A protein has these predicted regions:
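Conserved class I S-adenosyl-L-methionine
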Residues: 1-38, 145
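Class I SAM-dependent methyltransferase SAM/SAH-binding core
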Residues: 46, 52-96
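A conserved beta-strand element that flanks and buttresses the S-adenosyl-L-methionine
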Residues: 108
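A short, conserved alpha-helix within the catalytic core of class I
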Residues: 116-126
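Conserved beta-strand signature within the Rossmann-like core of class I S-adenosyl-L-methionine
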Residues: 134-142
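Short, glycine-/aromatic-enriched active-site segment of Class I SAM-dependent methyltransferases
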Residues: 141-160
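Short alpha-helix
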Residues: 161-176
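Conserved S-adenosyl-L-methionine
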Residues: 178-189
Length: 203
């Protein structure tokens, strides 16, 4: 099997990242609106696994967002993000290796955490090293046990993925020490259970 970063590099070359943006946009907007509605002062933001940077570009249009950073481990994704947004901040790094120079108020991630062998390690790393006190982590995953239609994705895409249940994901957030944990299914339609969204705050 290929590494996830190699797969995503190939997808950029084939312009498949544009399709990812279109597919993920409804759930991402749901997550961002949930998060933004709970922010009442200026805030900073990281998109973990930013791809071609479309979420960072969107967040930079938000009046209260003072700093938006995109981090991704795929070279071609970061290169494309920088081409599309010469003023944006995009960093090439494995998420487990990255530590921002200053912690942020909101960390978002869509369809990323299950590419890690042990997602709990990444949740803990982000919680401990990326997020300010009272800040929020919010992630979305379509690859989870109850979503039967996704069970062949790892084989079809040719890269390892960590299959977890909805309860497993929620338990990871609880075990990390995050507080005010909520989860829901976003954008259910046509037999698709929906994107599993999990969020919690640092106290």
């Amino acid at each position: 099997m290929k590494s996830a970063t190699r797969v995503f590099n190939e997808w950029v070359i084939k312009n498949k990242d544009d399709g990812m943006q279109k597919t993920h946009s409804p759930a991402v907007m749901d997550m961002l609106q949930y998060s933004l509605s709970r922010l009442h002062t200026a805030f900073s933001f990281i998109d973990a696994g930013c791809g071609n940077g479309w979420v960072v570009r969107y967040m930079n249009t938000q009046p209260m967002c003072t700093n938006a950073i995109g981090v991704d481990g795929a070279t071609e994704m970061i290169n494309k993000a920088k081409r599309l947004d010469t003023k944006g901040r995009y960093i090439l790094s494995d998420l487990l290796d990255y530590q921002p120079s200053k912690k942020v108020d909101l960390v978002h991630s869509m369809e990323v955490f299950y590419y890690f062998i042990d997602p709990s390690i990444l949740v803990n790393h982000v919680k401990d090293n990326w997020i300010e006190t009272k800040g929020r982590l919010i992630i979305g995953v379509d690859y989870y046990k109850e979503n039967v239609g996704c069970h062949n994705w790892s084989e079809d895409v040719g890269t390892p993925m960590k299959m977890l249940s909805r309860k497993d994901w929620v338990d990871i957030f609880h075990s990390s020490g995050l507080s005010n944990i909520k989860h829901w299914l976003s954008c259910s339609n046509n037999g698709f259970l929906g994107t599993l969204v999990i969020t919690g705050t640092v106290t």
